[in-house]
Amino acid sequence: MNIIFVIIVLSAFFFAGWHQIFFIPVKGGPSPMEVLSKAMIESATGAVELAIGLVGVMALFLGLMKVAEAGGLLTILARLIRPLMVRLFPDVPADHPAMGAMILNLAANMLGLGNAATPFGIRAMQELDKLNPQHGTATNSMALFLAINTSSVTLLPTGVIALRAAAGASDPAAILPTTLFATIGSTTVAVIAAKLYQRLSPLTVDDGADIQQAPSNSNDEVKMPLKDAAQGYPLWVSLAALTAMVALIPVAVFYGRSVSPWIIPSLMVGFLGFGLVRRVRVYEVFVEGAKDGFRVAIRIIPYLVAILVAVDMLRASGFMDSMVGALGGITGSFGLPAEALPMALMRPLSGSGAYGILASIINDPAIGPDSYTGYLVSTLQGSTETT
């Protein structure tokens, strides 16, 4: 990310500088470097204003997610996933801590709980390495878990919905159908590709490989509180849930416009009702979750400032227009507008960088959150994860 950030800034600087050298002054018109300077200051200010605008929406969604988490929704999802995971990872014992960590990681990602998913993912890789006969070389299970994690099975892209709401989208939750379709497709492709590659290039273990388990570092321990997740539901329950999720795609496509206005109110009523049924003190828990939303919105300010300033430098220097003109005909032929290309390139590399680019694109008056490009970049952010 350091190299990418520097390349973006230097490209904008030298592109604007080149135009400045050959600039023909126009009375009352700014020079290229003046335009660049103004864009930098305005984008830095705009990044802070955007983060402040996100506070309320992030507080709402993280408050609701906290109620769902306290009520045990994470455990329910983990129990649904477990029978499928046991079959996808035959090399990992069903009762091994690695299996539990992977299940909890995927369940947290489904709910958009990135902060909870990250430590589970790290713990999963640590535990998988203990089963690794050749440390330093990824096993088939490690590769498959990384592929599934990167494809990001997501049911509720709360962060993207919050950003779209802050950008003034007419229907912030309208990306749920496209996100669901994309995440199912990407996960299916990830599993098939990983399994095929395992067959085409089987893992070989050196005879002299160290087969000792990696030592456990007590400082890296991640609390695994969901003991109930160790007992999964029957396989038919998991398959029924998977079928229902796939069936939501055509329903969302054909009836999405009618259903989407109900999504956010239904989420609030549903999660609060779920919390009441599970005897959660919904008000207190909601407030605690909302505090997390405030902290998240404030914490992303430095990332937004860095990325929005860099992207606006590209735009103000004229480099972005040149890139759009050069690549628009190529990428546009398969449905990827050149304006969305920076997002497609950044998403696998940096979550915070992609979030900043998404904010820049959907807050651009020429694009907006309700355009095709706005929907596309929102779906890219909501349905994939960094590698």
Predicted features by range, described:
Residues 5-20, 55-66, 150-151, 158-162, ...:
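Hydrophobic core segments of alpha-helical transmembrane domains in multi-pass membrane transport
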Residues 17-37, 69-73, 156-171, 247-260, ...:
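Transmembrane helix-loop junctions in multi-pass membrane proteins
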Residues 80-85, 179-184, 263-271, 329-335:
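Small-residue-enriched core segments of transmembrane alpha-helices in multipass membrane transport
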Residues 33-130, 280-364:
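Membrane-embedded alpha-helical segments and adjacent helix-loop junctions characteristic
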Residues 128-236, 368-387:
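Membrane-core helix-loop-helix motifs of multi-pass transport proteins
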Residues 1-51, 211-297:
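Hydrophobic transmembrane alpha-helices of multi-pass small-molecule transporters
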Residues 6, 102, 146, 176-177, ...:
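Hydrophobic alpha-helical transmembrane segments
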